[in-house]
């Protein structure tokens, strides 16, 4: 087999598919490789870690022959990473799976493996499906993925919960301390359906999706889901189990409401958090008439800080504690200039809502409080 290809174009495609390859793979050595499948003038690249498989296609020039050969991903990426933009010639010996890469100034050779030993992409057993714009799915993942748990005992919390109805698409993530619920009315299924997407394929989607309005076709069953967009297909194994009733933990009818500039709040929290106890990172928020006081202290080192910010506040005077990194990270993942904090009492979860949502979108963030000692 033989073909010509742009060095930078091929490198970009190899980078995309290589993200799925496991850092340690003891079961199938061929999964350290990227599969090259040449058919006509189309080169298809595939990579897998057994649970997630990604496949993408690109056009090449002057192709001769056809077949499948797998090549070590580190060797490929290490070689192509240093090339400036230039045409490369790939010559593959189908008998011993040897590869010669010819550039303007040199030749690079190594041995691959029989592509027929590479695992096939799993078929999806199920007819649940929906379509969603790439930009919408990317935004949904960006707004939720950071909040997914890393919990060996509760595997269902380690992914993103796709909850679909005939009216809307909802994406949820929680680590039991924080919860994010993203809803969009532009995607839906014919009947209620749901699945839990693991973090690794979610991160892969985050890295390969574009900010455009091209549609992503999603098909899912009991065990696997398939995402198809442009020339790329991702198939992944789903997390088995029942996701917690996320709507049941969202407090309703919160009487105390704060409206405040988001960036001003972030900056103040960052400054005051420097003085918080290193073990708890506790920030105390004290609310009174149109004022928010943020304070922290570490009595072990005799340090303390406080700032008072102007805000719009409806409710009774109250104080509540939050873990500084969690509060700051939630605020950083909101786009609106202003946010609303809805609070009930110091022992119940607080809600953080953007004052402005994009069309057809709704975002809700929940943060569990920390106990105040005084």
Task: State each model region's role.
Residues 1-374:
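Structural preference for solvent-exposed beta-strand-turn elements
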